[in-house]
Amino acid sequence: MTRETLIIGGTVLALVLGGRGAKAQGRTPAVAAFTSSVDMVRIAAVVRDRKGRFVQDLTARDFEVLDGGQTQPITDLQRDVAGVSVAVLFDVSGSMEGHLPNAREAATHVLSWLDLSRDEAAIFTFDTHLDERTPFTIGLRVLPESIAHVVPFGATSLHDAIAQTARRVGEREGRRRAVIVLTDGADNASSLKPDEASAIASSIDVPVYIFGIVPSIDNPSADTSTRSIEVAAFTGPLADLATWTGGHVFVASTPGQRSIAARQIIAELRHQHLIAFESSGKPGWHPLVVRARSRDLTVRARSGYIAGQSRPTAHQEDHHVP
């Protein structure tokens, strides 16, 4: 098991923090400082019809890509690629006390929908540190024994953990990649804001799925007011974080909801269209809009990328705790 600090900033990751705030308010996610150029941009896009059904038999002519408001020609579109690669990220901070059994159940559902022959998963946990419990493994079906014995403790660096895990998943080239976060939505120790974490994940095209673990509304012992506060944690900035990356938020309070959400996440990854186009070349953050030419279809994809800044320099690597 490896453990990494979740201090992201200064000499550890050297972030240049740009505009903050929600995309919906006309502001852009913060930008991380990187050095090498980006020539080809790849986008994972999920398409649905008006009934919410997946649409997968599209060609490049069926899409339109706007890079900074300018239409860009699509140079490649693929649907048949290698398997799924997911990082399952457990929140094991103090606020998750009482929630971990449900989080473990949700993770087991996720693993059950993977293809044993080609899909891979890795298991991570975090409080104020990120721990790798299981490296990326094809055919993973069972959670590591250590997850069953974790005692929730400490503060929560949710946004930092998401950004750092996304970078790990980003190394899994040629796969349908995602971070799946099992959390109650609390964050009281991150150095990154939600939009800053989202910018890092979005820039490397790793969708983030937030799997909200909350008390069951059917549980008569659940405090209704407390539950309302916990559900509210998954709206606003945290929902923006997921949406900007092309992911989604699922709030699951029952075993049935957790099973359905897990199945939907993996199904979305399997139905991605992988679109490629040439970057316009201007350094910095590029807002992206990917849409279908048919008004009967809706597309979900990441909100942008960083041109001229695709890879961290050597002094920007994550710090490993001895």
Predicted regions and their residues:
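Scaffold/interface architecture of coatomer-like assemblies
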Residues: 21-322
